[in-house]
Amino acid sequence: MMKKDKKKVYLISNGDFRDSAGVVCWPKQEETLKAVQKALRKLDFDPQVIPSYDPKRKHGFLTKQYEGTQAFSKIDPTASVVVVLSCWAYSHHVSGPLQTHQGPILLLANFDGTWPGLVALLNHSATLDRLCVKHSRLWSETFGDDPDFMKRLETWCKTGEIKYDKCHLVSAEEMNLSSKAAQFGEKLAKKILHEKRIMGQLDPGCMGMLNAVINPAKLGAIGMPIELLNQSDLVAEMSLVDDYEAQSHLNWLIKKGAWFDWGTDQFEHLVHSQVIMQMKMYSAAVRIYQRYGLSAIGIPYQVGLVRSVPASDLVEGMLNNSERPEVIDPETKKVICKGKPIVHFNEGDIGSGVPQVLMRDIYEAKGMPPETTLHDVRWGREYEGKFIWVFEISGGAPPAHFGGWKNAKIYRQPKMYFPLGGGTCSGVSKPGVITWTRFYEQSGEIGMDCGTGEVLALPDAEVNDRLKKTTSEWPIANVHIPGYDRDQLMASHMSNHITIGYGNILEEFVATCLHLGIPTRVAGEH
């Protein structure tokens, strides 16, 4: 009797563009691959790892799109494929080949703070959704020792898909909005459609995040047309800012109580020259915002500026804050947007920029603090019976979210990703009710997910442990979203990013979206 051949499953190791990151992350990827291989063999499948380990590069990741296309050209186009994610990875390395792949596709990630495969999974999934590529999601902390993981993996191996209960998502049209909120939303939507809100996006497609790029026709239809700008122009504008102006901005921050983690070695520490360049970038961004009549601006930084200037993150935190150094318009000699935040969407992610502008307009109309920011959905775990998310932006949040500049800490960005350094704008987000949002494009249609939650004040030991397990230099928000815990969010969230602002404006936000013609879902309890 002939032995039955085991079905092959290809395990794809997608990674970062930077080999330095690949070297650091490879041991964890290797550990994850072994766990997934073991799990598949338990189910009588034959896992094949692609690409092979490269001894010269000291890792086995795909690091560019062409490497992804080459890898997929060598496998059966109908084969089962698992993209194994144990760290941050650029989704466009594999999204092109996956668009034409005919076999089942699974995005599989660890659920870990230090090694954020879950962040990459959410980004990859949102990218594939935008490109109309059918796929499934799966995540775990322990893989083969996790019964739910094994059950779902077996289901995917047999059927080619995994389905999740998404009863935590409700169409906003089913909400019983107050008449006051409905009228508010109608009025604001009419104002936006009449006046427009121009979205300034510098060099779209940061780090391969195609989910951060939205069809211009869809944006224009909701009154938020795109202004495509170049980061090279930002650098050129920086050269026009003199040292005196830059130093004045830095002096302002120090006077307000911002703490700088100064050092002497520019390759390891935060030094004065790095921050002066950041202050020039701040003035340049404000003037570009004014010149083009923008309602928001998004600086991707990675990878386009990483070899040119220090990090943009301190700049981003300053822009998104009402209390910030004044910048003068060289033509009118007037202060630009005095006493107001200039909405900045991190990493040029228009999926955050759109709700940030809507939230800003709502907050200002209601006389509430208008600061907003996006965060990575970085990790989470239970604390005293509640699942508390670690939301962590990769460098700069508005100090208003920490309770003011006196609570802001500026660290050097980690050298692995930021060789030219530059400061973060970090702190621990203050306790309070928040509204969260996410705008996206899926299968050719736009959508908005939103809800409410609460930033919690955790004991210092717990906060420090969460920072230690993620990235200690970055801003953190410890957030509980009732009804949107680990498995609910991981099953349905439409990005690796989530946008937050303080105060409950959910009804006004939903009403505005519906009147703009944006299909909207409300997640969790509300």
Residues covered by each model-derived region:
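An N-terminal assembly and electron-transfer interface module characteristic of large anaerobic redox
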Residues: 1-526
